[in-house]
């Protein structure tokens, strides 16, 4: 007989430490692609002899970000037909399929196969992004939910920092190792799926009280649509940092893939610090929390692009950018 789940006074389930850990581990799956980020300059060198341009090399990071949009949309569709954990498993399979890029030959066809693997990774990553929050929102309630939401960003930032350091060290040996290194997190993914619980569903998504399916898009105001567009554009600028830092570090003569890994891990580490510090100053800037975050990112971005070959200013810009991003 299955053990009965303990519940609070409102009837909400009270899950233990293992489920909480699993829910937090979901966000780390989104950052697995950070293994590859520092290797961008190394990949560029590997494919330069066959005429692959810098723009095409940048697509190695850009394509996953683009496909992540479609992956996030796909989650909303699949939730109507299958369980949340099943969707998570599909997302993980797609994402770890991205490690196959490490097996691609250094030919023109091999490069396009590499990009195809990045399409799969992007879809998986995009599917994981909303699920990292929804598992916490669906499984936990009250103060525990708020606490886990805060920890989620910190855990993601710390894991991304670790992955970038490891990826940079692997890329020094071979760019292929950076891609294959993603598989190091497979045991954690298996543990995450095993410990997670399927959220209790009171009502099917998209169904109102009368049992009829509604159109969620009709409830979105023009102002909300405008915000979607504005923040979509801002996200494009954010990913410029992610996709070009490795190339910029090498172009400025600051170092190779390992140095790029350390610098980018600093950004994700600062994101984690910002996430942990946010509750301390939340609401203390007159509701302009998001504006302050964007301003910090803009300051950091400006310092980075104007730092030239000054490594100290590059690091300072990274700190500002990372804190704003977090």
Regions found by a protein language model. Give the residues of each.
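Extracytoplasmic gate region of multi-pass secondary transporters
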Residues: 37, 223-271
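Central cavity-lining transmembrane alpha-helices of secondary-active solute carriers
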Residues: 59-77, 265-277
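C-terminal transmembrane helical hairpin of 12-TM major facilitator-type secondary transporters
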Residues: 287-326
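Extracellular/periplasmic helix-loop-helix junction of adjacent transmembrane segments
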Residues: 39-70
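Cytoplasmic helix-loop-helix junction between adjacent transmembrane helices
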Residues: 111, 117-155
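Conserved MFS/SLC helix-loop-helix module at the cytosolic interface between two early adjacent transmembrane helices
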Residues: 70-109
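Extracytoplasmic
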Residues: 17-48, 241-246
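Helix-loop-helix hairpin linking two adjacent transmembrane segments in secondary transporters
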Residues: 151-197
């Amino acid at each position: 007989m299955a053990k009965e789940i303990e519940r609070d006074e409102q009837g909400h389930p009270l899950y233990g430490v293992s489920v909480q850990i699993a829910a937090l581990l979901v966000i780390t799956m989104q950052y697995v692609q950070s293994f590859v980020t520092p290797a961008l300059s190394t990949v560029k060198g590997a494919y330069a002899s066959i005429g692959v341009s810098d723009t095409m090399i940048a697509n190695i990071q850009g394509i996953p970000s683009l496909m992540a949009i479609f992956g996030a949309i796909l989650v909303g569709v699949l939730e109507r037909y299958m369980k949340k954990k099943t969707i998570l498993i599909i997302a993980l399979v797609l994402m770890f399929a991205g490690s196959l890029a490490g097996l691609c030959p250094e030919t023109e066809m091999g490069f396009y196969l590499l990009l195809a693997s990045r399409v799969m990774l992007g879809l998986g990553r995009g599917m994981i992004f909303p699920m990292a929050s929804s598992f916490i929102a669906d499984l936990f309630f009250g103060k525990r939910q708020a606490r886990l939401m805060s920890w989620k960003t910190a855990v993601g930032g710390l894991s991304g920092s670790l992955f970038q350091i490891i990826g940079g060290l692997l890329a020094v040996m071979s760019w292929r190792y950076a891609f294959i290194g993603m598989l190091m997190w497979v045991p954690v993914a298996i543990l995450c799926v095993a410990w997670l619980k399927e959220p209790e569903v009171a009502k099917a998504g998209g169904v109102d009280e009368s049992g009829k399916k509604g159109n969620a898009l009709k409830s979105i105001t023009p102002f909300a649509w405008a915000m979607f567009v504005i923040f979509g554009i801002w996200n494009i600028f954010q990913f410029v940092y992610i996709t070009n830092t490795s190339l910029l570090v090498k172009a400025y003569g600051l170092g190779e893939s390992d140095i790029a890994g350390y610098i980018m891990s600093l950004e994700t580490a600062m994101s984690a610090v910002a996430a942990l510090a946010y509750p301390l100053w939340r609401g203390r800037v007159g509701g302009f929390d998001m504006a302050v975050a964007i301003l910090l990112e803009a300051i950091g971005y400006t310092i980075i692009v104007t730092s030239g070959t000054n490594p100290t200013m590059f690091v300072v810009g990274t700190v500002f950018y990372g804190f704003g991003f977090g």
